[in-house]
Amino acid sequence: SINKELAGGNMSVYPVPTKALTPAPKGYQPFYLSHYARHGSRYRTEEIEYKNPLETMKKAKENGVLTADGEKIFDLLNQVYEYAKGHAGDLTMVGALQHRGIGHRMYDNFPEIFGKEIEVDARSTTVIRSILSKVNECMELQSLNSKLHFYNDASPHDMYYMNNNNPLLNQILADPKLELSKIFTGTYLESTTTPDRLMKVLFNNQDYVRWVVNAKSKIGRAVQQECRDR
């Protein structure tokens, strides 16, 4: 069957892993675990990414160019905007559950480590969504074994390796002569975006789309992404 959730592209929620782990070699057992993760599912990083699509659709509604499906999407965008207001970049409830799931799988898969009294060193960047991701993971482990001792920290001291910013790498990725740079500068997206079908679903006047919505603009792409996210 087709998983429609994958239409969200890199905004799709990570699937819960179901594959069996490779057992340890005979005569060996786990004694230490080092885990490095990204934060869980988050809201869009800028509130304007919710506001701009809504304003575009609101203007289209005022001009009477929304289709019946466009009206439905407009209503959904209103709901999404109200729910997401003030949450730009925050960890979502899904994101919190993802990290609780990671903590639970750690406990289930490595009882030799987490089934006894040990110390857990848990660190994150200073970004709120990362801190809360870490905390949810630790809370899940704590609920499964009250004998675990946690050291939690979120400090600029550790940012150099957790969220490293390499100026030379950024310069290389921004080089227009490199094919790879197209992905990071947005030109690849511009060249591969074909929104005509979606625009016909949302709007009943394609001249309006071309001259007002500008489907290949940042706002137009945001409308498409919000539609996929729903």
Predicted regions and their residues:
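Signature for phosphate-centric chemistry
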Residues: 1-119, 127-230
